Each structure stands twice: as C-alpha cells, then as structure tokens.
Design a protein with these regions (language model features):
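A short, sequence-level motif marking secondary-structure junctions
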Residues: 38-40, 60-63, 278-284, 323-324, ...
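Iron-sulfur (Fe-S) cluster-binding modules
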Residues: 1-2, 8, 14, 18, ...
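Iron-sulfur (Fe-S) cluster-binding segments and ferredoxin-like electron-carrier domains
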Residues: 289-291, 296, 306-355
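Ferredoxin-reductase
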Residues: 2-93, 97, 110-113, 149-151, ...
Length: 356
C-alpha cells in the first residue's frame, strides 16, 4: 500500500559536515502507522526542479512517542541528499511513507543474546536504532559494534555511541576503525574487509559466539564481511545485510524478456487494475507508473524492497534482487521494479505484505 503522510520537521541536527539527522513530528493519530521495527527505513518524497524524487533513509533512533528520525548523508551528485542537508529546516512539511523494509531486529525482552553490527560510513544509521533498542529492551543481551570511517571527524553519531557506551559499559563493545587516522593499535587502522575481520578474530573476537550479525555499508565491504563471518563460524542465516546502493552504477532490468503487449493485473488496496506493457517499459513498475498507478516504490534498483509484491498467477522474470529473503522468494514475492511478465495474464498483489 502506498501510504504517504505530510509530516512536519521538528528539528534538523548536524552529525558531520555532510550528514544531518531529520526528526519528524508524528501526530497522535498516526503513531500506530509509523510504528517500526529497528532497522527499517522511511521513504521521503519531494519535487525538485519540477521532478518528483523519492529516497529511502534509515530510521536512526529508537522509538519515541510523537517523533521519528532519519539520517541523511549528502553524496556526490545526490540531488535529494544535498537538498535534505542544505534546505530542509524545522517547520517544513514533507511527504513521508510509513516505515518499510525487511532489515532489522525486533528485540525480545526475555532473550539473552550476543549480537554483532558491522558498519562503515553512513551504514551506521540503521545500526544505531537496532543497538539502542536492543540494549534497552533485552537487559541480558550484549552488542559488539565494528564501525569503520575515514577519521573520527567523519564519524556519524560519535557522541550518541559514546553515550550508549557510558550507559551500557559492560554490554556494548565499540571498535572504531579509521582508514585515514593514525592510531596506537595497527589492528584498528585500515578498512573493514575480510582480512581485517580475520585479524580481529585472532586477537580480540570470537565471531562464532554471535547469535546474529547485521552489516551495512559499501557493497564490497558487505560482501567481504559476509564471506569472512561464514568462514569464521557464523551460520549464513544469522547474517543480515542492508544495502543502500546496488554494487554497480547501472541498474539491470529484465530487458531480455519480450513483454510488449502483455497484460498484468495489479491488485492494490483490494482493487484490481489491468495494465498493458510496451516495448519501452523496463519493468512492471515502470509500466504501471506510466499508466498512472500509484504504487509504492523508492530506489528502483532492487535494493529497498518498497515495491515488493506477490505473484498470484503466472510467471515473471526478476533481473536483480538485493533485498528479498529466500523464504520470500519461495513464497512468490518479487520486486516490481526489476520484474517483467513471462506468461500471459499475470496477477501481482501489492497488498500482500505479511512477510515484511
């Protein structure tokens, strides 16, 4: 379901020279709609130079009644991120979709777990909400955070992490690794990669002891970290990844599929609508938007899963998937931004969000 609401910006706080935290006020009538699992994201919508842009940003703080916060780091060529950093101010209103996303962890107060977070740069944003919420909700659990940055000056949430360490001195272990800052310990200098994790395992950490691991950052770091954790004894199904970007600069679509003239039925908000694909349509989502459908989407790159739907009839080809879990694929879920029909009379259901 595509559900945007106009939310007022309560405050904008600088985190580094390039990053800000934007906190939205959530009225009492919408607090249930904006309840979230730590690790999820919000999709923000704005018109810039006459063009509607949508971008996903991770929720970066634990749940607090009446507000919800995301962090935005301005990137080179990032129209929306630079707009967010430079122009969004307290008192403005923005269109904000209700929380989405598969990534994250829902704490269980009776659980006693040892969790690992590996983040680089802005990859810390979903981790902060997960770590803060888990340590508060699970009094017998502990968290180890490995956080990579160029330097301490580029480190997002430096003070918040220090405060968490002060609050949970025996339950939070924070390892900061800097690539461009000289440190006393060579172990904490460099980049987070497979070699670094293996070095940490030899002298500091037993990775096989962790019950769950959460990874977010550049694609190469994430892939290296995942491979290393499996080699160091962590089960594959205990490792959870959140990708902000696709590994390549060019989004791949199911372009080899000949879908010109195919009909697809969209089920949304309990209603069916038929669309007809043309040769120019790169995906079901592309065709639907061209024909005026108001479907949920954000990245269009197979990363955020905002456009997830379930195939009820027929078969589709999905070119790229960086977000759906194996059980979702087995249940028939696809990303509409990456899918084209293979058979006639395909039906896809955008109301089927039960596995999110």
């Amino acid at each position: 379901m595509t559900t945007f609401h106009s939310l007022t910006v309560a405050k904008v706080e600088p985190e580094t020279r390039e990053a800000v935290t934007i906190t939205f006020a959530v009225p009492q009538t919408l607090q249930t709609a904006y309840a979230f699992r730590p690790g999820q994201h919000l999709t923000l919508k704005a018109k810039l130079a006459g063009e509607e842009l949508r971008r996903c940003y991770s929720i970066c703080r634990r749940a607090v009644p009446g507000e919800i916060s995301v962090a935005v780091k301005a990137i080179e060529g990032g129209r929306f991120s630079r707009y967010a950093r430079d122009e969004i101010k307290a008192g403005m209103t923005l269109e904000v979709m209700i929380p989405q996303g598969n990534f994250g962890y829902q704490p269980q107060p009776a659980r006693s777990g040892h969790y690992l977070a590996i983040a680089a740069g802005s990859g810390i944003t979903p981790m902060l909400a997960i770590v803060e919420t888990t340590l508060q909700a699970e009094p017998d659990s502990a968290f180890t955070v490995i956080y990579g940055n160029r330097s301490s000056q580029s480190m997002m949430f430096r003070q918040q992490l220090a405060d968490l360490k002060d609050t949970y001195p025996t339950r939070l272990q924070l390892l900061s690794i800097f690539s461009q800052e000289t440190l006393d310990s060579a172990l904490l200098h460099g980049r987070i990669d497979g070699e670094k994790l293996h070095a940490l395992s030899r002298s500091l950490l037993n990775f096989s002891q962790f019950d769950e691991a959460f990874i977010c950052g550049p694609a190469a770091m994430m892939d290296d970290a995942e491979t290393a954790l499996v080699a160091l004894g962590m089960p594959q199904n205990a490792i959870h990844l959140e990708r902000f970007n696709t590994p390549g600069s060019t989004v791949r679509h199911a372009s080899s599929v000949q879908a010109d003239g195919q009909t697809v039925t969209l089920r949304q908000d309990g209603r069916d609508r038929a669309i007809v694909l043309s040769a120019d349509d790169e995906s079901i989502l592309d065709a639907a938007l061209r024909q005026g459908a108001d479907l949920p989407y954000a990245c269009k790159g197979g990363v955020c899963a905002t456009c997830k739907c379930k195939v009820l009839r027929g078969e589709v080809s999905m070119a790229t998937n960086y977000s759906l879990e194996p059980d979702e694929l087995a249940a028939g879920y696809v990303l509409s931004c990456q899918s084209l029909p293979l058979t006639a009379d395909v039906i896809v259901d955008f109301d089927a969000k039960g596995m999110a």
